[in-house]
């Protein structure tokens, strides 16, 4: 019983780490990265379609994203979606491809992005602590139902806390690495 509780908590914490990594990949660090466009949807035949399903996205230079639509007729729709997005980038079209030039980040922008990174990291820690609370509650229920002894409960609580501490350390490291990446010029 105790192994299942820990395994379940660990799995949920790993999912939280993956979610954090995805969030961090969407925060631009002054370099071109195709994952910046993962959240962009384009109206295509009346339904929102992810941009990466409608166009090839390449990184020809460090600060340039090149978007090559599979169907040239949707070029304007892609431009419209990029302009409406919260990326703050202006698409440049030459009729066949769209270029997105990623500007160098100003010091102020870097600091604001670093604050965002801290906030996202903190939210992730809250999620981890909620997972710990759920696991602790589950362990206490198991003890009340006489599925585990009081000694096993104490051991299980220590194990859950250790898994939680490891998960928080991982989040701290991921957050610090992303901040460092943002703040280096």
Curated annotation (Swiss-Prot):
Protein name per its UniProtKB record: Ribosome-recycling factor
SUPFAM superfamilies: Ribosome recycling factor, RRF
Family (UniProt): Belongs to the RRF family.
Subcellular location: Cytoplasm
A GO cellular component annotation in the UniProt record: cytoplasm
A family per Pfam: RRF
Gene source species: Streptococcus suis (strain 05ZYH33)
Molecular functions (GO terms): ribosomal large subunit binding
Chief location of this protein within or outside the cell: cytoplasm
Gene3D superfamilies: 3.30.1360.40, Ribosome-recycling factor
